[in-house]
Amino acid sequence: MSTKFIFVTGGVVSSLGKGIAAASLAAILEARGLNVTILKLDPYINVDPGTMSPIQHGEVYVTEDGAETDLDLGHYERFIRTKMTSRNNFTQGRVYKDVLHRERRGEYLGATIQVIPHITNDIKQRVYSGAEGYDIALVEIGGTVGDIESQPFLEAIRQMGTEIGRERALFIHLTLVPFLGPAGEVKTKPTQHSVKELRSIGIQPDILICRSDRKLPSNERAKIALFTNVEEKAVISLPDVDSIYKIPALLKSQDLDYFVCRRFHLDVPEADLVEWEQVLYQESNPTGEVTIGMVGKYIELPDAYKSVNEALKHAGLKNRLTVNIQYIDSQDLETKGVDSLAHLDAILVPGGFGGRGVEGKILAAKYARENKVPYLGICLGMQVALIEYARNVAGLVDANSTEFNAQSASPVVGLITEWLDAEGKVEQRDEKSDLGGTMRLGAQKCHLTPGSKVHAVYGSDEIVERHRHRYEVNNNFVEQLEKAGLSFTGLSEDKKLVEIIENKDHPWFIAAQFHPEFTSTPRDGHPLFEGFVAAAHIHQKASS
């Protein structure tokens, strides 16, 4: 059948949870047997989020095909089985860049390039292309209705609604209905004005999802329906909940999926949410708890480590444990010492870039090694564990990464200096190269050493994990580090690059160059995080 489109916009304020709402609806539709995908359209001018500050933008989520994308794509993959690709996320900057590139090549035959039709046509083509082959495509428009940056995207989806007709296009508007304490009531006026703004550009929402800190009374839903020209049963109340994984059931209880299927004339089975019921059961019935310290430098914005946070929670579900995450600024370890690590059941050092706070991360790895505390290093977290071991065990006292000290006499971690590009040509990469689009990215195979801890964790000889990094373990130091007792138990497909290290004299000390957090889901978990949380619980019991 022809793809049906559900366009999701937001109003009043940003960060209302459009991505979670879209992903939750997608999960219900998928549970009805439909083939579903989700696209995210970002209005900012950056070509992609790859070089944006994690403190401003949150984490950069990496897809299987190596696209650096918005963190909402992580939500999408955690809620539905469909794997996201580079087609599932694009920015206004990417659109303008490509349109201007075609203009320079003369592809517009000298025409004056305008937002309408050239920019909007490019947006529409990307949406159609990204949705191809699916029963339903949800399209989330970043930002808020009324933002200048969002106007080309809103115009594009307005045109799409006209082109494909009401039987294939449905508009959902997510809005805020605040509760005013002194007045003792919810206020619908912001929602009314937000819908008025949306209608002024030619889009009439079919469904309103109203965010509030409480369930909306039926009389307020009726009032909103009256003033926004939306069916009363299509005004959905979405109150705050203590777990985002409750939202699919919450939306289903208000027949949101039924409304969508009726609108699209879809005769499909009822949604079976038994997998989500199992997730909620595991979440609400823990048998214990562990405290894991996450040592990083972007801790003022937890969304900078969004997928790691979620992966730890998923591992807690599989172990029937509540995972309490304590964020520790790595710079504090440099200035105040490591006493803040003493009460932890495990230590995790996630990825990152730049030299700020690196010595604190090295101290965290040293503390975990010396005190037999379970340690999981991810990307930079592996590199600092390697540097620490080289300095304090292998005798390479000046060991470092060339990212932090280009003149190090023992550069145990170094820049990727050449590889093949997509056309099979050799490219040179050094410290003078552009930062954007110059990394080892996406899903790659890794061979595991039989008999190693990580082999036992995965239960497989070969795995596929996603990468996002420029620097690698320097193979010139591998033999010396192995003689000092460090184990290199995961190698790239061609056996030339180190992917995983282990400390064989430690109960659980594993560090990986890749990012396992990107493939963890609440329904399936991830073996590396599950093993890590289980080790934290064992350490807790042994220490008590």
From Swiss-Prot:
Binding site for Mg(2+): 72, 140
Keywords (A to Z) from UniProt: ATP-binding, Glutamine amidotransferase, Ligase, Magnesium, Metal-binding, Nucleotide-binding, Pyrimidine biosynthesis
Binding site for UTP: 14, 187-192, 223
Cross-referenced InterPro entries: Class_I_gatase-like, CTP_synthase, CTP_synthase_N, GATASE, GATase1_CTP_Synthase, P-loop_NTPase
Catalytic activity annotation: UTP + L-glutamine + ATP + H2O = CTP + L-glutamate + ADP + phosphate + 2 H(+); L-glutamine + H2O = L-glutamate + NH4(+); UTP + NH4(+) + ATP = CTP + ADP + phosphate + 2 H(+)
Region annotation (Amidoligase domain) ranges: 1-266
BP-aspect Gene Ontology terms: 'de novo' CTP biosynthetic process; pyrimidine nucleobase biosynthetic process
Keyword Nucleotide-binding: yes
Chain residues that bind CTP: 14, 147-149, 187-192, 223
Keyword Magnesium: yes
Additional note from the record: CTPSs have evolved a hybrid strategy for distinguishing between UTP and CTP. The overlapping regions of the product feedback inhibitory and substrate sites recognize a common feature in both compounds, the triphosphate moiety. To differentiate isosteric substrate and product pyrimidine rings, an additional pocket far from the expected kinase/ligase catalytic site, specifically recognizes the cytosine and ribose portions of the product inhibitor.
Self-association and partners: Homotetramer.
Family: Belongs to the CTP synthase family.
Role, per record: Catalyzes the ATP-dependent amination of UTP to CTP with either L-glutamine or ammonia as the source of nitrogen. Regulates intracellular CTP levels through interactions with the four ribonucleotide triphosphates.
Name used for this protein in its record: CTP synthase
Lineage: Bacteria, Pseudomonadati, Pseudomonadota, Gammaproteobacteria, Alteromonadales
